[in-house]
Regions:
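Glycine/proline-enriched, intrinsically flexible loops and inter-domain linkers
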Residues: 1, 5-690
Length: 690
């Protein structure tokens, strides 16, 4: 079996409100931000964007098994909004690499520089660079020029060449670099600078699909499915044979030199002749002086809202609702190594916390990946948003037998408008806190990441200028190896009567609802948002949970996230197709013994999005499990039991039901948003029958 291979993929979306025709939600009606003619609407993006991702996955032959989808829009002031008119569309994946190949080797004098893959085209010119420019009417032409084109077939050919080289007894590739932002103008200098070398490049040797391209366009375009790599001259014949066997284009475009000079030339003239130090020399740190102030934290009053109305709205919010329309368009089993995709249980409910694949066809060990993001919190407290995103990603994969938390590796993608000193300050402090306060204390690493610091769009509308910028957004992807795939726990209640459902509180009893799905759908300015209360206690929880997984004492596991505790419980009931009785004990949650005021607390308790987990435990292990968590300072509460009807009932502290409804009815509401998009995108009759 291949030692070096790509495995599975992930895909995520942040967009502004969808405003689906004939299905416009109450929280969308009062925020009506238009779009300039040059950009697609959020609904158009969510109809066409996922099709692009899934078709590429299908053509390339890798399953997309994980992701997220968030819509967000909020008015800041007149003509100024938070939102994702400049959307976040994140794609990534997981792979395995043998320990003989993970380090790049030293490029030496006269080693060949090769471009592998497709030709240069006048597409994506300034693409990655343009993503770091604020969008406005003045650069509308660049907006269109920045659009890149995909070619999954070419990518697969490149992958086969790389696989053959990396899985041979001796890898003839010395060093390799994918061509991304900046095109060859970035990839070539970087690959030689890593080895303190220079390079002489013949621009005429760079493959071009369009012979009219200028030297600048050849050098800077960001045509996809290309790699820059270095090999020894003596290995050129072998490399050529591999490329011919895979029908993959390549060209020797130059060679490395000792003189640390970058030269781009043709037979008649030199276009670039620069010392490498000029490109990569140390720059002084930018100093920004900001008069910061303490974040004003004031909670909102939810006592006047009806519980059922809140639940209906929250279940309809895209961040909470079913993501089925994003999933069924892709092949999730290609390659034959998928262990867990987005769908859970025999009823195939899309609520998976993580994606899991096997290493090989023995299906003994494998890999897990998950995602975490809390962008809606960032408009209140960017630092808390970053910390919560990391912890959410880790909680999402905690249901897999990972073992030591230090085995988890994170990827961080940072998005910000970065257009004022406060945004810069908040981004800096968030990055500082995520690394020093969270990752260092957990013992996990963030070896990779990306950023886009231009998440703002402005345009003229009549005599007004409209501005839409994104919150400071951190998207965290978590990856780890899994040992013993038979021990993975699913977010699905098992129909075992002699069991209890416990809530594991990782927020020390806090019930802050700022930045929650609830505050978004009710359009409430709630300035008290969730935070990571005790990161060392969080680490202890992870370690203890891993022990319980290995000893097979957990029946189901689902972390509390968008929508809060109530949606966590309901989703697990959907997947298991079982009913649940939920118990609200006044003493446990430290409320006043006043039955009239008790119901005012229900909404905050059930809809807050503090860190927490719901587990189903067999009653024979219940006391032991609660004791183990108690010993590390974590409180757990028996929150629910299974019932014989497919319905949810919530009991107050007097054991009187105050809420009861059919889970089938809630499931239809939860699925409605996905259905409405499918109805527009796909055959409407097929969507209706489904």
């Amino acid at each position: 079996f291949l030692l070096n291979r790509s495995s599975d993929l992930l895909c995520g979306f942040n967009v502004s409100n969808l405003n689906i025709p004939n299905f416009i939600q109450s929280w969308e009606e009062n925020i009506s931000v238009s779009y300039p003619d040059r950009i697609a609407s959020s609904l158009d993006i969510m109809i066409d964007g996922p099709l692009g991702a899934s078709s590429y996955n299908n053509e390339f032959g890798r399953p997309c098994l994980s992701g997220y989808f968030r819509t967000f829009e909020k008015k800041i002031a007149d003509n100024s909004y938070f939102g994702y008119h400049k959307p976040v569309m994140i794609a990534g994946g997981l792979g395995a690499i043998d320990n003989t190949n993970y380090k790049k080797n030293e490029i030496k004098d006269n080693d060949l520089i090769i471009v592998l893959g497709g030709p240069s085209m006048l597409v994506g010119l300034g693409g990655g660079a343009a993503s770091s420019k604020q969008s406005s009417k003045e650069n509308e032409e660049l907006d269109f020029a920045s659009v890149q084109r995909e070619n999954a077939e070419m990518q697969r050919r490149c992958q086969e060449v790389i696989d053959k080289c990396s899985n041979s007894l001796k890898n003839i590739i010395i060093s390799i670099h994918d061509v991304g932002a900046g095109g060859l103008s970035n990839a070539i200098p970087e690959i030689v600078n890593d080895c303190q070398m220079g390079a002489i490049i013949d621009i005429d040797k760079i493959p071009c699909a369009d012979k009219t391209l200028s030297p600048l366009e050849i050098w800077c375009n960001e045509s996809q499915e290309r790699y820059v790599l270095a090999i020894k001259p003596k290995h050129l014949d072998i490399f050529e044979k591999i490329c011919l066997s895979e029908n993959c284009p390549f060209s020797v475009i130059g060679y490395a030199t000792d003189d640390k000079l970058l030269v781009l030339k043709d037979d008649s003239e030199s276009y670039i002749e620069l010392p490498m130090d000029l490109l990569f020399g140390e720059k002084g740190k930018q100093q920004i002086k900001v008069n910061s102030s303490a974040i004003r934290e004031t909670s909102a009053d939810y006592s006047g809202f009806n519980f059922h109305d809140c639940l209906i709205k929250v279940l309809s919010l895209p961040a909470v609702a079913s993501k089925q329309f994003l999933i069924t368009i892709g092949d999730r089993s290609v390659g034959g190594l998928t262990v867990q995709d987005q769908f859970i249980g025999p009823w195939q409910v899309p609520i998976a916390d993580c994606a899991i694949t096997a290493n090989d066809f023995s299906f003994k060990d494998g890999e897990v990946m998950s995602m975490g993001e809390k962008a809606s919190i960032a408009i209140i407290n960017p630092i808390a948003s970053g910390e919560m995103a990391v912890c959410e990603a880790i909680l999402n994969l905690c249901s897999s037998p990972v073992g030591n938390i230090a085995k988890i590796a994170l990827s961080a993608n940072w998005m910000s408008s970065f257009d004022n000193d406060f945004d810069k300050y908040n981004l800096f402090k968030t990055a500082e806190s995520v690394t020093s306060n969270i990752c260092n204390k957990l013992g996990v690493t963030i070896p990779v990441g990306k950023d886009s610091l231009s998440m703002k769009m402005s345009w003229a509308e009549g005599n007004k200028e409209i501005n839409v910028k994104s919150p400071n957004t951190l998207i965290v992807s978590a990856f780890a190896s899994v040992h013993n795939l038979k021990n993975i726990i699913k977010p699905m209640f098992v129909n075992e009567k002699d069991s209890s459902i416990i809530f594991v509180d990782l927020a020390d009893g806090k019930k802050r609802t700022g930045g929650s799905a609830l505050s978004q759908v009710l359009q409430i300015d709630d300035l008290e948002c969730p935070k990571v209360e005790n990161i060392l206690k969080f680490k202890s929880f992870f370690e203890e949970t891993q022990n319980l997984i290995n000893s097979k004492k957990i029946l189901s596991y689902h972390d509390k996230s968008d929508g809060g505790l109530i949606t966590t419980l309901i989703e697990s009931a959907f997947a298991g197709h079982v009913g649940i009785d939920i118990y609200y004990n006044q003493d446990i949650f430290g409320l006043r013994k006043n039955f009239d005021s008790e119901r005012d607390q229900y909404i905050k308790f059930f809809f807050n999005e503090e860190l927490g987990v719901v587990m189903q435990i067999s009653n024979k292990f219940l006391t032991e499990v609660q004791k183990l968590y108690s010993e590390i300072g974590i409180k757990t509460y028996v929150i629910a039991k299974l019932n014989s009807e497919y319905e949810v009932t919530i009991y107050d502290s007097r054991d009187k039901p105050f809420y009861n409804t059919s889970l089938e009815a809630l499931h239809k509401i939860w699925h409605r948003t996905s259905y409405e998009i499918q109805k527009i995108r796909d055959n409407s009759k097929t969507s209706e029958s489904e």
